[in-house]
Amino acid sequence: MKLIIAVIKPFKLEEVRDALKDIGIQGLMVSEVKGYGRQDGHSEVYRGAEYTVSFVPKLKLEIVVADKDASKTVETISEVAKTGKIGDGKIFVTPVEAALRIRTDEKNDDAI
């Protein structure tokens, strides 16, 4: 199993979720996060005063998939979340040692 962590622009969430459903990915976790990379924040004007926003709001998606589904999941997120502009996000893939569905005690691939 793999844990796929994707950091994307918030307005891309629905499109990414729908695309993942289309390839059979049934669940994901979403968290609101803030961060910076090459984008390095931006300036905004509020009530006539300019403010520097150091951290950019993003969404973090966490998806556990079977090994056989990892490449297609990453490819789908990348294709759908891409705008071609700085700040599109990142995708990380890490191994998952075990999974357990609490309600049924199903384990590993059966639990996801």
Which residues fall in each region the model found?
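Positively charged, small/polar-rich N-terminal and surface patches that mediate targeting and assembly
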Residues: 1-112
